[in-house]
């Protein structure tokens, strides 16, 4: 018990009376030796053959990869790090030379090349000396069609007709120039071609043969419709001839004039003209008050 109560060595407050081996070691460490200064690397001196190899690679590329640097380093017997530093210094020297050339004032007569003018927004980007021509041959400039002797553009107009092999009359000059239909619209008579007689489609002579080569057996039974619907009204796309021809023949729009019959029964008629002897008002075709006027032949 008494051993634990022995006081230790006395330490003064201002640490002037410190004693012991640990305290002595701490005081000895106060005087540290200075760190050794890094030795400067020796300056590399390149020979003429080494510079020729380095300049040849620098002419090819200013930023060689590690494989190219190692290959040159083996040729000139230098470490790859020296080759890398040489390229770094060579690029800096090249930039410095370019900067000095820009800062030097140029004489007045040295400016031979004029600065290209900026293109405006409305100017065409293509020029006569364009290196890349248009592969499709499409130019920006529009060439108008050639004018004929009458002053109208010579535009080829294809007249389309349905079931009409004969040559149609050419369109007027006003329609050929602007291609604008001067007659009534075609939609005003949508049922004009539906109820046209079959014999009227082959009434005009053509290369297909005689006029009665088609539907020759039905011509006597469809004969009342031929005078009302002329040849010019057969072509729905032939211009202004559609409107007047249909307006003059209101009976051509009535589909009830045919009645209901079969082609087999119609061939057995002895008197073809007697089957169509019914009278009615063209303006009121649906009002058949007097059925005695209907003179159909009973089979």
UniProtKB/Swiss-Prot annotation:
An annotated GO BP: visual perception
Entry-linked InterPro entries: HD (IPR001356), Homeobox_CS (IPR017970), Homeodomain-like_sf (IPR009057), Otx_TF_C (IPR013851)
Main location group: nucleus
Chain ranges passing through the membrane: none
Signal peptide positions on this chain: none
Pfam families reported in the protein's UniProt record: Homeodomain, TF_Otx
DNA-binding region: 39-98
Keyword tags: Activator, Developmental protein, Differentiation, DNA-binding, Homeobox, Neurogenesis, Nucleus, Sensory transduction, Transcription, Transcription regulation, Vision
Role, per record: Transcription factor that binds and transactivates the sequence 5'-TAATC[CA]-3' which is found upstream of several photoreceptor-specific genes, including the opsin genes. Acts synergistically with other transcription factors, such as NRL, RORB and RAX, to regulate photoreceptor cell-specific gene transcription. Essential for the maintenance of mammalian photoreceptors.
Family the UniProt entry places it in: Belongs to the paired homeobox family.
Stated name of the protein: Cone-rod homeobox protein
Organism expressing this protein natively: Canis lupus familiaris (Dog)
């Amino acid at each position: 018990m008494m051993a634990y109560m022995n006081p230790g060595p006395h330490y003064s407050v201002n640490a002037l009376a410190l004693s012991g081996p640990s305290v002595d070691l701490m005081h000895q460490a106060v005087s540290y030796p200075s760190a050794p200064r890094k030795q400067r690397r020796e300056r590399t001196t390149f020979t003429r053959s080494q510079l020729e190899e380095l300049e040849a690679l620098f002419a090819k590329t200013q930023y060689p990869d590690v494989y190219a640097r190692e290959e040159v380093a083996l040729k000139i017997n230098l470490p790859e790090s020296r080759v890398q530093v040489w390229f770094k210094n060579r690029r800096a020297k090249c930039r410095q030379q370019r900067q000095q050339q820009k800062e030097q004032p140029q004489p007045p007569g040295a400016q031979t090349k004029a600065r290209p003018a900026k293109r405006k927004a409305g100017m065409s980007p293509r020029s006569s000396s364009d290196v890349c021509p248009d592969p499709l041959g499409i130019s920006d400039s529009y060439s108008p069609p050639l004018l004929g002797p009458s002053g109208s553009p010579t535009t080829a107009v294809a007249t389309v007709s349905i079931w009409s092999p004969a040559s149609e009359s050419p369109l007027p000059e006003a329609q050929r120039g602007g291609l604008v239909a001067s007659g009534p619209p075609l939609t005003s008579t949508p049922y004009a071609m539906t109820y046209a007689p079959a014999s009227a489609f082959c009434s005009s002579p053509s290369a297909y043969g005689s006029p009665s080569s088609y539907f020759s057996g039905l011509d006597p039974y469809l004969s009342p419709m031929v005078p009302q619907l002329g040849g010019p009204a057969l072509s729905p796309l032939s211009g202004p001839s559609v409107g007047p021809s249909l307006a003059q023949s209101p009976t051509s729009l009535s589909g009830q004039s045919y009645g209901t019959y079969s082609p087999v029964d119609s061939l057995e008629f002895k008197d073809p003209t007697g089957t169509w002897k019914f009278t009615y008002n063209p303006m009121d075709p649906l009002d058949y008050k007097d059925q005695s006027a209907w003179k159909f032949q009973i089979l």
